[in-house]
Curated annotation (Swiss-Prot):
Full protein name: Large ribosomal subunit protein uL6
Oxidoreductase among keywords: no
GO molecular function terms noted in the UniProt entry: rRNA binding; structural constituent of ribosome
Database matches in InterPro entries: Ribosomal_uL6-like, Ribosomal_uL6-like_a/b-dom_sf, Ribosomal_uL6_a/b-dom, Ribosomal_uL6_bac-type
GO terms under cellular component: cytosolic large ribosomal subunit
Assembly and interaction partners: Part of the 50S ribosomal subunit.
Task of the protein: This protein binds to the 23S rRNA, and is important in its secondary structure. It is located near the subunit interface in the base of the L7/L12 stalk, and near the tRNA binding site of the peptidyltransferase center.
Natural source organism: Roseiflexus castenholzii (strain DSM 13941 / HLO8)
Residue ranges that the Swiss-Prot or TrEMBL entry lists as coiled coil: none
Listed GO biological process terms: cytoplasmic translation
Domain of life: Bacteria
Keywords: Ribonucleoprotein, Ribosomal protein, RNA-binding, rRNA-binding
UniProt family annotation: Belongs to the universal ribosomal protein uL6 family.
Cysteines engaged in disulfide bonds, as pairs: none
Length: 187
């Protein structure tokens, strides 16, 4: 039995969960609404403020989907109550981010600035640098964990951190393994 799949999901006050035909789960909360179609092989029940997930059989695929389904529902409940965020750090001489309306303008060493338009349900926040040596932070917020992570990965992919000076865009919690530069010529 899946250890994660067995755990019941408590539904906090102010969150409304509906399970429609075909395992279409709708979660409404203070921050918004999320709708997700989940695998039909799972049995999802909502009783007494608790959601439980069970599987039809003990097949390998059903065992794999059991924990996944439970995690997806738990992420939806967390998303509509607390929301999700990823923090990116921009490091480099002349590298900066500016918010223009909803859009994000990045100057990260290309000959032109890069304009990033957020998808539906995602917001960007740009923190100003406190000192010249500190990296600039961009916060990506939203209620859908997958969209927040995907948008953060797309921004990081524009200029991944390089190992020699550490310039580029990285996640706040990411550690960049630094390399030594060229060794001097021996005489």
């Amino acid at each position: 039995m899946s250890r994660i799949g067995k755990k019941p999901i408590p539904v906090p006050r102010g969150v409304e969960v509906t399970i429609a035909e075909g395992n279409v789960v709708t979660v409404k909360g203070p921050k918004g609404t999320l709708i997700q179609r989940l695998p039909p092989e799972m049995i999802i029940t909502h009783e007494n403020g608790v959601i439980t997930v069970a599987r039809l059989s003990d097949q390998k695929q059903h065992r794999a989907l059991h924990g996944l389904t439970r995690s997806l529902i738990a992420n939806m409940v967390t998303g509509v109550t607390e929301g999700y965020q990823r923090v990116l750090e921009i490091t480099g001489i002349g590298y900066r981010a500016v918010r223009e309306g909803k859009n994000l303008i990045l100057q990260v060493g290309f000959s032109h600035p890069i304009r990033v338009t957020p998808p539906e349900g995602i917001t960007f926040e740009v923190m100003e640098r406190r000192s010249a040596n500190e990296p600039q932070q961009v916060i990506i917020r939203g209620i859908d964990k997958q969209k927040v992570g995907e948008e953060a990965a797309k921004l990081r992919a524009l200029r991944p951190p390089e190992p020699y000076k550490g310039y580029g865009i990285k996640y706040r919690e990411e550690r960049v393994r630094r390399k030594a530069g060229k060794a001097g010529k021996a005489r």
